[in-house]
Amino acid sequence: MSGFCVLGCGTMGKALLTGIFDSIAENGNDVSDEIIIPNKFYACVKFPKEKEDVQKLFGDRVKVVMGAKENAEMAAISNVLLLSCKPQAAEDVLNSPKMKEALKGKLILSILAGKTISSLQSMLDESTRVIRIMPNTASRIRESMSVICPGPNATEEDIKFAEWVFNGIGRSMKLPEKLIDAATAVCGSGPAFVATMIEAMTDGGVMMGIPFPQAQELAAQTMVGTGRMVLQGQHPAMIRNDVSTPAGCTISGLLALEDGKIRSTIARGIEQATKTASGLGK
């Protein structure tokens, strides 16, 4: 038996459980022998309304509990725990009675913003393994870009399991923890930056006579399609050059964007967001 427990089953916890169940339904046991697929699922919540919502969503596939005593009991019978409570509640959750003992030798997948591996490890037994992960808001539609940062005592099997879990809600990439602030800026804050670009393209279309709903769909699908071409191996510069014919409308528009310093403005936005992210955990 392999148990998977979600400590704090809010929006992200529910998205990850949904991804796990969908992955199991789609692929069954057709995964690497190094990955032990959970067959028991538990969710720990704080309020009755949360318990009702999780139970309604997953039915008898997930056992939902409330209270520190119950949290520790579920942790004790689980092999892997997803730490997805509010970051400021982490200390109370991990230092609650019997929890430290229950987590000995277990794997913790933490998605807590600003909580470093070392800060979490200081609250846990040295035998507890920690992997820090940063998913993004697109996890809601299983299109997340998640960054996986293994702790020093995480095993290869632990990392493969984390990748399996987070690939269920999109894509994942392993990076050292020292790069997580930059990754937070690119793919954590990135949806807000991309949404702003979609808004700007939409506004331009409306300005030139396209009704708003159609302009927004045109802009959004163009962003999605271009992203998929890049993910399939096409370099952004090649895509740009392929569309830019001599004396054409594309190169004319690109020059106007370059006049507005679009490249350096976006790059500086990433730089500033990285600096801000680095201060969140201090």
From Swiss-Prot:
GO terms under biological process: L-proline biosynthetic process
Superkingdom per UniProt: Eukaryota
Record-listed E.C. numbers: 1.5.1.2
Pathway(s) where this gene product acts: Amino-acid biosynthesis; L-proline biosynthesis; L-proline from L-glutamate 5-semialdehyde: step 1/1
Matches recorded under Pfam families: F420_oxidored (PF03807), P5CR_dimer (PF14748)
GO cellular component, as recorded: cytosol
Keyword NADP listed: yes
Any one GO MF annotation of this record: pyrroline-5-carboxylate reductase activity
Annotated keywords: Amino-acid biosynthesis, NADP, Oxidoreductase, Proline biosynthesis
Gene3D superfamilies associated with the record: NAD(P)-binding Rossmann-like Domain, ProC C-terminal domain-like
Catalytic activity, reaction form: L-proline + NADP(+) = (S)-1-pyrroline-5-carboxylate + NADPH + 2 H(+); L-proline + NAD(+) = (S)-1-pyrroline-5-carboxylate + NADH + 2 H(+)
InterPro entries for the chain: 6-PGluconate_DH-like_C_sf (IPR008927), NAD(P)-bd_dom_sf (IPR036291), P5C_Rdtase_cat_N (IPR028939), P5CR-like_CS (IPR053790), P5CR_dimer (IPR029036), Pyrroline-COOH_reductase (IPR000304)
HAMAP family from the UniProt entry: P5C_reductase
Similarity comment text for this entry: Belongs to the pyrroline-5-carboxylate reductase family.
Protein name per Swiss-Prot or TrEMBL: Pyrroline-5-carboxylate reductase
